Amino acid sequence: MDWKHDLYKKVAPFIRSDAIFATNTSGLSITELSNGFTSELKKRFCGVHFFNPPRYMHLLELIPTSETDSDVLDSLETFMTSVLGKGVIRAKDTPNFVANRIGVFSILAVFAEAEKYQLGFDEVDAITGSKLGRAKSATFRTSDVVGLDTMAHVMKTMETNLQSDPFYRIFKVPQVVQTLIDMGNLGQKTKAGFYKKQGKEILVFDGANYVASTGQIDSVVERILKKPINERLELLRNESHPQA
């Protein structure tokens, strides 16, 4: 937040009176970011949240404050959809907006379950990807794509602002994420995070070192996942295997 405020102080005097001023943030309050602006600039300020990698990710969140001019939003949405080909949703100025509020909650919930049942990161990804109707990047590969430093900022926003949420107890940066950040392993952009490619081999972080990735779905759980969906959930609930 402070970094952005410092930057805004430097650029604000040079912003044309007909220019739209937009910020890309993963979840910081757009209203708080506009503190210190003139009333006229506040009308032309909003959040525009792209998703990584923006070249391929269709979703874009458009986040106004209570003072953003509706014409500004309409113009931006038209440009984003017709020129950039994005799928735009208008989000409220709440912590982490829509996608990260849901997505990072989902990742943190998986972290908690993985720790509880002592499951490896590659093992969890084998379970939480296409087998659950999600992207093949699943949980921890997705985290690597997002960037662990970026994801940690989103998690801290949840920890700071969502004390009344019933799942607040899991809203914190997991120790393993902090460990990887301290190592400088931020995910795909540093070529190492939860996963690391060494030659043709994919390695996975085990909490201390990178080891060969061998995670796969147990045959018991695999058989259940092939059942009709109306039977699948009950069978998983009744199965004692940690993956279930």
Give the location of each predicted region.
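N-terminal glycine-rich phosphate-binding loop for ADP-containing cofactors
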Residues: M1-A244
